[in-house]
Amino acid sequence: MEAIKGSDVNVPDAVFAWLLDGRGGVKPLEDNDVIDSQHPCWLHLNYTHPDSARWLASTPLLPNNVRDALAGESSRPRVSRMGEGTLITLRCINGSTDERPDQLVAMRLYMDERFIVSTRQRKVLALDDVVSDLQEGTGPVDCGGWLVDVCDALTDHASEFIEELHDKIIDLEDNLLDQQIPPRGFLALLRKQLIVMRRYMAPQRDVYARLASERLPWMSDDHRRRMQDIADRLGRGLDEIDACIARTGIMADEIAQVMQESLARRTYTMSLMAMVFLPSTFLTGLFGVNLGGIPGGGWRFGFSLFCILLVVLIGGVTLWLHRSKWL
């Protein structure tokens, strides 16, 4: 493949444009640099920036059917070979487990053995690990190593997020054993996050597996082996997600049962109170009719005797309920 001039990929508002030095480090790309397989270029763009959008729409370095995909038209993880290059769409985790499940950020990239063009709108936090390694001189030396390191960083972030969700489920299960109900919406958010993760990480695992099996010229056998390991690791994470989704379903049933039992206890208590006070209510209503005068109204001990009668009646009903094992 022909070499590319640095001026051909000069985008003023690029997030960064670096030239890999072939020894694990990078340097800022300059117009007189020569880009080839020994010194590939990494151009990282925000496709919403005007200069980046114009470059994506006009550069001859990109196939026509790649431009729309890099400009944000593609969202689900996938991989497509485009002649000598490859178009890859990946998803990564941004944010924490307390946020709504919209923290999956899309990253789109087109690459061959000479240069890498990656685009995003929101910042991709997983790339910070790769950027840090390159700045320290311990990063990838070629395009194949770069792709493996990026996929490894994305999977690390996904695995950490899945582990955090798993810990929350364990805490929730422990609380349910103590009859503690989680706040409203907590379990629904947790389940939604798991479902969204499952939706995007399953095709991403397939992307990794395909990259491991494709005979891409810029990926060595070691790169393919590492990529297969990454796919297997993400597959284990998906198995964990499936188990967590099943456990949230069981917890939802358990929460419903706990709430139903609590409501039944309250209803039972109110029914017993009604049974205890029903006879006394009947007597007070009967004596309060006052059609022929209140019985005992002219006797000074009448009210006291009536109160004693009510206490004895309530005690008798309570004793009967206790002997009947209703209390």
From Swiss-Prot:
Species annotation: Salmonella typhimurium (strain LT2 / SGSC1412 / ATCC 700720)
Quote a single Gene Ontology cellular component term. Answer: plasma membrane
Residues reported to bind Zn(2+) 2: 166, 244
Described function: Zinc transporter. Acts as a Zn(2+):proton symporter, which likely mediates zinc ion uptake.
Keyword terms of this UniProt record:
Cell inner membrane, Cell membrane, Ion transport, Membrane, Metal-binding, Transmembrane, Transmembrane helix, Transport, Zinc
What name is this protein filed under? Answer: Zinc transport protein ZntB
More details = A role in zinc efflux has been proposed by Worlock et al, but ZntB was later shown in E.coli to likely mediate zinc uptake, using a transport mechanism that does not resemble the one proposed for homologous CorA channels.
Give the main localization category. Answer: membrane
Record GO terms (molecular function): cobalt ion binding; cobalt ion transmembrane transporter activity; identical protein binding; magnesium ion binding; magnesium ion transmembrane transporter activity; zinc ion transmembrane transporter activity
What the entry lists under HAMAP family is as follows: ZntB
Q: Gene of origin?
A: zntB
Q: What is known of its domains?
A: Forms a funnel-like structure. Contains three Zn(2+) binding sites, two of which could be involved in Zn(2+) transport.
Enumerate the Gene3D superfamilies for this protein.
CorA soluble domain-like, Magnesium transport protein CorA, transmembrane region
| Membrane spanning residue stretches | 274-294, 301-321
Query: Subunit notes for this chain?
Result: Homopentamer. Can assemble pentamers in the absence of the transmembrane regions.
Q: Which residues are listed for Zn(2+) 1 binding in this entry?
A: 92, 157
Places the protein is found: Cell inner membrane
